[in-house]
Amino acid sequence: NFSANNHVADAANISLGIVAPDGRDGMIQHSEEFAEAGIPFVFDPGQGLPMFNRDELLRFIDLADYAAMNDYEAKMLEEKTGKTLSDIAGSLKALVVTRGGDGSAIYTGGKHIDIPLVTADEIVDPTGCGDSYRSGLLYGIQSGFDWETTGRLASLLGAIKIANKGP
């Protein structure tokens, strides 16, 4: 994997970043570079979560402004770090946990906001549904939307994706 060859400083006009599943070294490097540059970012460990140890995961949480993951990854993060979701959320501006057919939850400012599922007209292709959700999350953060609006937008985009076949 060559993601570590890319550097935050080489890109222009970055105001928000995401560290998503990629090569281990690249994820660590990009988190450090976003933090050093003062650029807020979302830590989205996804299927890459198991390759990090407790201290590395706590470092990601310390550097990140936000974190997003599904409920399985959230449980694994709790187990690997020994921290509760409330503890983890307390270190972030927001922790977003998607729960499949049960919608999602946003932990922010000591509050827990339940975001209802937007039901798709039909299930055509779930591939990319999480990515679509993340795009709504990033758009809401970038636009300064409140968390309920951001979560509802993210859920809507996930539903639109699941109802359509796409690349």
Model region roles, listed by residue range:
Residues 1-113:
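Ribokinase/PfkB-type carbohydrate-kinase core domain
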Residues 81-167:
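Conserved phosphate-binding/catalytic region of the ribokinase-like
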